[in-house]
Amino acid sequence: MFGDRQRPMVLVLGLGESGLAIARWCARHGCRLRIADTREAPPNLAALQAEGIDAEFVGGAFTPALLDGGIEIVGLSPGLSPLEPALAALVAAANERGVAVWGELEFFAQALRALGTSGYQPKVLAITGTNGKTTTTSLTGLLCQRSGKKVAVAGNISPAMLDRLASAIDETALPDVWVLELSSFQLETARTFAPDAAAILNITQDHLDWHGSFDAYAQAKGLIFGATTTRVLNRDDAAVMKFAPAAGAADAPRTVTFGLNEPTQDGDYGLSRDNGIAWLVEAVDRDAPDEATTTRRRKRDAAHTPDIAQKRLMPADALRIRGLHNAANALAAFALARAIDLPAAPLLHALREYRGEAHRVEVIATIDDVDYVDDSKGTNVGATVAALDGLAQKIVLIAGGDGKGQDFGPLVAPVARWCRAVMLIGRDAPVIRDTLAETGVPLAGHATLEAAVHAAAELAEPGDAVLLSPACASLDMFRNYAHRAEVFRAAVDAIAIDKGATP
């Protein structure tokens, strides 16, 4: 379970969800435990004690002295930035001493490897990206389930991977397929993780305070791929396509792309438009035998030039999730499921079935022919750009909060194209206002979200959408993004009551 180590002594840094899962897993396998947190009494300490886990707890600043006493593995929680000086010093000391530094994902990878010696060989699918991870992960899980597979969905989406694995072992119900949502934080400490197929949905500015630079952030995303992992890449995103193998590279892993245009390479996915209808399509070689339309395509002669046709899969409007960005998410999920040779028919039925996730471009009400859309999970600029372009209608946008040092410049073009007005809230409202001034779109600041919603309702015209997609974190005004969504919904409910409508 721990490489070549038998019941090692483990130092767990940070007692969040992943840290607690690491502690549980290590205790389950007889490891000696030391747990450290910068907080003297982190919330999960009570859970640790209630479960009877025998561990030494140390609260306070991290120091290299935490490694003393025979520590063999450091288990690092994903919320801890490696750039924080005290943590960086501790990790450097661990490296000098030859102490392994793993995150939960590496513990999980090592556990699957150990279980493999007993014959357990599941398929593993993984998803990362700045935006769309949860939707695509949930959808991929549903697709695999509707194909008759026993599926476990875990990771950044919750539950923690190790907790889900432990429960599957206890219930003697190990899944056929693991579908993992993985953040850049979780991937940062990946060492031997090698899923069967993995997707990078997009890479835009986010978490730069944690990674230090955009390049470091993108590099962490790329750690989702093992040497033989099928790569599912968004061809519309230049940062993502940097992970495509060089043309003609020897022993290059299989690569499948998806995008919002017509695919031109055999086996890729995209959108094709005909008579005003957008279709989800797969590019297929007309000259290929039928069996070559599966993901295990036979190698072609180098001189063969494919005659590409667009094989229609389903109309994009048949998806219950709205927006072009969700069509892209659906294509990514379909590509992942096909990468492990699941049959297409049940996958297409499942695509029509999926209703989406809360707070992700979720239409919560239509009042006087105006849609009210909750995208409170849109905590970065890329998410808001995707929501604006995806809805593709006139919009009164509500944005603002803690911008986390982002560049708001990418909002200019979609705001100019789609927005009737922008209502601004939160700490970085002035920064967003300055950035959007060149659009010529009316901009108004509001002290509360409730005030912004009511003002947006007054400006919206029939056929418009009032969209909460803040492009910012929520903690300057709310407990979290879900609380922000609750306030938005309550304000919309109040508008419905005022207008005598049913939200």
Swiss-Prot record:
Pathway: Cell wall biogenesis; peptidoglycan biosynthesis. It is an enzyme of class 6 (ligase). SUPFAM superfamilies: MurCD N-terminal domain, MurD-like peptide ligases, catalytic domain, MurD-like peptide ligases, peptide-binding domain. ATP binds at residues 129-135. It catalyses: UDP-N-acetyl-alpha-D-muramoyl-L-alanine + D-glutamate + ATP = UDP-N-acetyl-alpha-D-muramoyl-L-alanyl-D-glutamate + ADP + phosphate + H(+). The keyword Cell cycle applies. GO terms for biological process: cell division; cell wall organization; peptidoglycan biosynthetic process; regulation of cell shape. It is found in: Cytoplasm. Cell wall formation. Catalyzes the addition of glutamate to the nucleotide precursor UDP-N-acetylmuramoyl-L-alanine (UMA). NCBIfam families: murD. This is UDP-N-acetylmuramoylalanine--D-glutamate ligase. It comes from Burkholderia orbicola (strain MC0-3).
